[in-house]
Amino acid sequence: MSFTTRSTTFSTNYRSLGSVRTPSQRVRPASSAASVYAGAGGSGSRISVSRSVWGGSVGSAGLAGMGGVQTEKETMQDLNDRLASYLDKVKNLETENRRLESKIREYLEKRGPQGVRDWGHYFKTIEDLRAQIFANSVDNARIVLQIDNARLAADDFRVKYETELAMRQSVESDIHGLRKVVDDTNITRLQLETEIEALKEELLFMKKNHEEEVQGLEAQIASSGLTVEVDAPKSQDLSKIMADIRAQYEQLAQKNREELDKYWSQQIEESTTVVTTKSAEIRDAETTLLELRRTLQTLEIDLDSMKNQNINLENNLGEVEARYRVQMEQLNGVLLHLESELAQTRAEGQRQTQEYEALLNIKVKLEAEIATYRRLLEDGDDFSLNDALDSSNSMQTVQRTTTRKVVDGKVVSETNDTRVLRH
């Protein structure tokens, strides 16, 4: 982006003298040139000034056509005195201009070539710092992502831990129930064994009682000694009958014993099967519980490691943020310092520009008056005091036009145009 700015400066009005020429005056031209280059804030301003001063020794001669009037002599003497004083001022201004040029040249040599300060190393430092800030921001984002991943992993482990804990509690509850079942089964088995023992004792008691009754009956029969003859059919053999009854009782007892043995054997087998099954289930449950405890310990260890890693990452994040905060404060301080230097440089350039404009206005005034004196000295034959007095009341305006070409906020070229307007 480039654009051109044009500024116009008008100096204050001043009075100029009319043209007077004396025939006996010889004029010797003296020329001087000045070139000033100054820069502020990375912009340059080139000002070239050329001026010509005509001076000479004014001899004492009478003014043609004026009749030796005393007032005209006094006027010429006054003009000569003013010319000498202005020539002295011009010399002083040239000396001051050379001194200012040397100062400006020294200042430009200190600031760099062509009045443009080299900000390249600052830009390079800023770019490096920006790259570091970007890299640190990426590292910070990666650390935050790792923290989020660790937090999610910790949440997953917490959910797994709660699930495994619920499973463990359920298995422990099942084991407790199975233990109650085993205890109930053992109690039932003991009760059945007690009943079997009682039935065995009852069977032995019945056998003994039966034998005693049989022996009693046999004794009664043997001791009676009675012979009864009855015209009746042949009586049955009592011993045989008793043997049959004994055999029936023994068969019945054997049958009852076998049924009881079979029943209680079946009950014992069923109880043993149940106990074996429950024992296998208990062993499986104990194995599962052991595995769950190991898994729980592993998860607790992983959870502790994740917590420690999370704490370390948070500490690293805090340190990184603190370090970058300090770096940002340092960079802000550097930027403020550079901005203050830039503002001082611009202010110094503006001050020097104002001083130069003031000197240029004075120089233009002096050149105009010197030109007037030169015309007075050259055109002495046509000089008229009334014309000189009339022309002394005329006004002149110095118009100074400055044109600057700005590209991307920087002044790349500047031209000055000075014009003297008479009124």
Swiss-Prot record:
Q: Which portions of the sequence form the region Tail?
A: 381-423
What does the record say about PTM? Phosphorylation increases by IL-6. Proteolytically cleaved by caspases during epithelial cell apoptosis. Cleavage occurs at Asp-231 by either caspase-3, caspase-6 or caspase-7.
The segment annotated Coil 1A runs over 72-107
Q: Where in the cell is it found?
A: Nucleus matrix; Cytoplasm, Perinuclear region; Nucleus, Nucleolus; Cytoplasm
Asked whether the UniProt record includes Coiled coil among its keywords, one would answer: yes
Task: Specify where the region named Coil 2 lies, as residue ranges.
Answer: 242-380
* Region listing for Interaction with DNAJB6, in residue ranges: 236-384
Q: Looking at the record, which segments are called Interaction with TRADD?
A: 69-121
**Marked site (Stutter) residue numbers:** 264, 324
Residues annotated as region Coil 1B? 126-217
Q: Which residues carry this modification: Phosphotyrosine?
A: 37
Q: Which residues are glycosylated?
A: 31-32, 50
Q: Which GO terms describe its cellular component?
A: cell periphery; centriolar satellite; cytoplasm; cytoskeleton; external side of plasma membrane; extracellular space; intermediate filament; keratin filament
**N-acetylserine is carried by which residues?**
2
> Does Nucleus count among this protein's keywords?
yes
- Tell me which residues bear Omega-N-methylarginine: 46
Looking at the record, the residues that make up the IF rod domain are 72-384
Q: Which residues carry this modification: Phosphothreonine?
A: 295, 397
Q: What induces it?
A: By IL-6. By fibronectin.
| Principal location | nucleus
Phosphoserine PTM sites in chain numbering: 7, 11, 16, 19, 31-32, 35, 43, 50, 52, 57, 60, 85, 137, 170, 384, 391-392, 394
Q: How does the annotation summarize its subunit structure?
A: Heterotetramer of two type I and two type II keratins. KRT18 associates with KRT8. Interacts with PNN and mutated CFTR. Interacts with YWHAE, YWHAH and YWHAZ only when phosphorylated. Interacts with DNAJB6, TCHP and TRADD. Interacts with the thrombin-antithrombin complex. Interacts with FAM83H. Interacts with EPPK1. Interacts with PKP1 and PKP2.
- Reported function: When phosphorylated, plays a role in filament reorganization. Involved in the delivery of mutated CFTR to the plasma membrane. Together with KRT8, is involved in interleukin-6 (IL-6)-mediated barrier protection. Involved in the uptake of thrombin-antithrombin complexes by hepatic cells.
Spell out the protein name for this chain: Keratin, type I cytoskeletal 18
Species, as recorded:
Rattus norvegicus (Rat)
Q: What is the lineage of its organism?
A: Eukaryota, Metazoa, Chordata, Craniata, Vertebrata
* Gene name in the database record: Krt18
